A protein has these predicted regions:
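Short strand-coil-strand connectors
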Residues: 65-67, 91, 114-116, 192-196, ...
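Forkhead-associated
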Residues: 56-104
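Extracellular/luminal recognition modules and glycoprotein regions
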Residues: 36, 41-58, 62, 67-68
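Extended, aromatic/histidine-rich regions of cofactor-dependent oxidoreductases associated
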Residues: 239, 245-283
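Acidic/His-leaning functional-site neighborhoods
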Residues: 188-235, 245
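Intrinsically disordered, low-complexity terminal tails and inter-domain linkers enriched
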Residues: 3-28
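Surface-exposed beta-loop interaction hotspot
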Residues: 116-185, 192
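Protease-labile, long low-complexity intrinsically disordered regions enriched in Pro/Ser/Thr
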Residues: 87-132, 136
Length: 283
């Protein structure tokens, strides 16, 4: 790693104008969140370490260049065939023969298939299988310096209301890899900014929290082309905190091989959201 992540994040506070609430608990909580984000992104198997997403439909013979083993799709699994010279392990044990694999769900570092420090992670999207390769020695991880983020400003911590749809819906949206896929949506978040009501369509996560993909007037200019927002679970009356100070860069801001969805229709705000994470900064 080319720099100390926590020091970089502290340096980003230089020059704040006093409107950020730096003496209060909200700012301190945000600063801690920001520092933890930098550390997580820069982790050995964090998003910076992704060096490839290989769709098995592109390799009918199951042989992926520079990835050991043979990967063949079955009905509900992928069958990996390996020889001792491939250097593959499955569940920590050397692979010599076949192993049936399903999609990995846990942390990248605990994925079932490895080759030394590299992790080979199975991904399933709309019936298509892919192998993702995470390498702690990736050029992106080596070059990473910090995440550029706007210091906390209470103006961007808003009260919102979640309005669930009667029935969950799926819309087709372009993804960062150029393909179009379905994006599940469970409702919309309504909030008021400078006297104007705005809404964002959002997905509902298994734990009840929300997830929205949005763009705004800063996107592609002073910030990345789109960002994520992850509010907590609404209360029983639908009230939810909409804190743009914690707007996140999507994984594809850190590695080109992620397949992040673009914002769905209606999720491009006319306002300039000068808050949250803006861009990745490299050395």
């Amino acid at each position: 790693m080319s720099t100390d992540a926590q020091q970089d994040s502290r340096d980003s506070r230089d020059g704040r104008d006093g409107r950020d609430g730096s003496g209060n608990q909200d700012f301190q909580d945000w600063q801690r969140w920001h520092e933890e984000r930098i550390v997580a992104v820069a982790a050995p198997h964090g998003p910076l370490s992704l060096t490839g997403t290989h769709w098995l439909s592109d390799y009918p013979d199951g042989r992926i260049p520079a990835v050991p083993g043979q990967w063949r799709t079955g009905r509900d699994e992928v069958v990996l065939t390996g020889a001792p010279e491939d250097g593959l392990t499955v569940d920590g044990k050397p692979l010599a023969g076949e192993a049936g694999l399903t999609a990995d769900r846990g942390p990248i570092g605990s994925s079932r298939v490895a080759r030394g420090e590299r992790r080979l992670v199975l991904l399933s999207r709309e019936g298509q299988w892919a192998v993702r390769e995470f390498d702690p020695h990736s050029p992106a991880r080596h070059d990473f310096r910090t995440i550029d983020a706007t210091p906390y400003d209470a103006r961007w911590s808003l009260e919102g209301t979640f309005r669930p749809y009667d029935t969950a819906r799926t819309v087709r949206v372009a993804n960062a890899d150029g393909r179009e896929r379905g994006l599940g949506l469970g409702g919309e978040i309504a909030f008021t900014l400078d006297g104007t009501e705005h809404t964002l369509q959002a997905a509902v996560e298994p734990d009840g929290s929300l997830w929205a993909v949005f763009a705004d007037a800063t996107s592609g200019n002073s910030s990345y082309r789109f960002r994520f927002l992850r509010p907590g679970a609404p209360d029983e009356d639908g009230r939810v905190k909409v804190d743009f100070n914690r707007a996140l860069l999507p994984p594809c801001a850190f590695a080109d091989h992620f397949i992040c969805p673009f914002p769905p229709p209606g999720n491009t705000l006319t306002a300039a959201v000068a808050a949250g994470e803006r861009n990745r900064i490299d050395a």
